[in-house]
Design a protein with these regions (language model features):
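Short, well-ordered junction/capping motifs at the entry into regular secondary structure
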Residues: 1-2
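Extended alpha-helical targeting/anchoring segments
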Residues: 6-184
Length: 184
C-alpha cells in the first residue's frame, strides 16, 4: 500500500509498489493463504487466481489486489465458506491461528468490528461479506479510526507506520468534514 498525491506520482508509485520485493512477497503470501482457505471448502480443481497483483487506486492510497475464486463443494454451506475465509488473512497474517494469538497478546485494545465483516447470508444459501476496514466508529460523540499494516521479515518499521497513517487518512478526513458540517 502506498499513498497517492498526484496523477503523475501514481505512475511512479505503481511501478515502485510492484517492484518492491517486500510488498510482492507479502502479497503472494496472502494470495496463497486465500487459496488455502478456499481449498478447504471448494472443489480443489476449481480454486484459481483469476487476477494477480493488479493495482487498485482509492482516494488516498493504492493497493496491490488479487482475486481468488472457487466453486463451493456441494457438501459445504455459505457458513462453511465464511468460517474458512474469515478472519481474512489480510487482517490477521499467517499462519492464521498463531497470528490471531499474537494479535490478542500484543494489541492494547480489542479490535471490535475493525477487521471483522459486514454483510449478509440469505435464504438461498448465498453470502456477501466485506471486511470492516477504512471505517470510522462513533460512540458517545467520539470517533475512532483503526488502521494497520502487514509485518513481515523485510518490514521497515517507519514505512509500516506511514502505511497505517496513509490508510487512516481518508476516514479521519471524513470525520473532520462531518464535524465541520455539524457546526454549520
Amino acid at each position: 500500500t502506498l499513498d497517492r498525491s498526484s496523477a503523475a506520482s501514481d505512475v511512479y508509485k505503481r511501478q515502485e509498489l510492484l517492484a518492491d520485493p517486500k510488498e510482492r512477497s507479502e502479497h503472494i503470501m496472502l494470495v496463497d493463504l486465500a487459496r488455502n482457505d478456499l481449498s478447504r471448502v471448494c472443489r480443489p480443481e476449481s480454486v484459481e487466481v483469476v487476477s494477480l497483483m493488479d493495482i487498485k487506486r482509492f482516494s488516498h492510497i493504492m493497493h496491490i489486489c488479487s482475486t481468488v475464486t472457487g466453486q463451493v463443494d456441494p457438501h459445504m454451506t455459505a457458513f462453511d465458506v465464511f468460517t474458512s475465509a474469515f478472519p481474512a488473512g489480510t487482517l490477521s497474517g499467517a499462519p492464521k491461528p498463531r497470528a490471531i494469538e499474537i494479535i490478542d497478546e500484543l494489541e492494547p485494545a480489542d479490535r471490535g468490528i475493525y477487521g471483522g465483516t459486514v454483510g449478509y447470508f440469505d435464504f438461498s444459501g448465498n453470502l456477501d461479506m466485506a471486511i470492516a476496514i477504512r471505517t470510522a466508529f462513533i460512540r458517545d460523540h467520539e470517533a475512532s479510526v483503526q488502521a494497520g499494516a502487514g509485518i513481515v521479515l523485510d518490514s521497515v518499521p517507519a514505512s509500516e507506520w506511514q502505511e497505517t497513517r496513509n490508510k487512516a487518512e481518508a476516514s479521519v478526513e471524513a470525520v473532520q468534514i462531518a464535524a465541520q458540517l455539524r457546526q454549520l
